[in-house]
């Protein structure tokens, strides 16, 4: 009986780790950044991290407008990457799919931010979201040069 309980606990621990967001830098190091699918995912992750920040800090706070504009920029880039990947796909269908993915990621990131705030006193303590946002900002800045 003890072996069965230990096995069940082990399975649940694997499942809980399987659904966590991989740090974006780690993801990019493991994948080909020239692949439109990878670029679309990167764009959706960057959009989601910025949207999560807008939800967390609120409209009246400093930084909201920057985060919201970054979200919109990354959303549009994700759409462009989708066009490269699936040129024949209906734009409305593509937009809905991209938006759905971004919202799913945003919901997870918002939970991570809240959990970090509750357990550590800082929204960025114990997670990779600030590192992801910084990476996204560096990418946008390097493209703009």
What residues fall within each predicted segment?
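Interfacial loop at the N-terminal end of multi-pass membrane proteins
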Residues: 27-28, 116
């Amino acid at each position: 009986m003890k072996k069965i309980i230990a096995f069940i606990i082990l399975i649940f621990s694997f499942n809980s780790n399987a659904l966590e967001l991989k740090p974006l830098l780690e993801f990019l190091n493991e994948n080909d950044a020239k692949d439109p699918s990878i670029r679309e995912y990167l764009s959706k992750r960057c959009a989601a991290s910025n949207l999560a920040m807008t939800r967390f800090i609120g409209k009246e706070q400093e930084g909201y407008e920057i985060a919201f504009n970054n979200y919109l920029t990354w959303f549009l880039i994700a759409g462009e990457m989708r066009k490269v990947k699936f040129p024949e796909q209906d734009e409305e269908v593509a937009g809905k799919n991209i938006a759905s993915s971004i919202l799913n990621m945003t919901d997870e990131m918002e939970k991570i931010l809240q959990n970090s705030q509750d357990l550590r006193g800082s929204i960025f303590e114990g997670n990779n979201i600030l590192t992801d946002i910084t990476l996204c900002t560096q990418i946008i800045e390097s493209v703009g040069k």
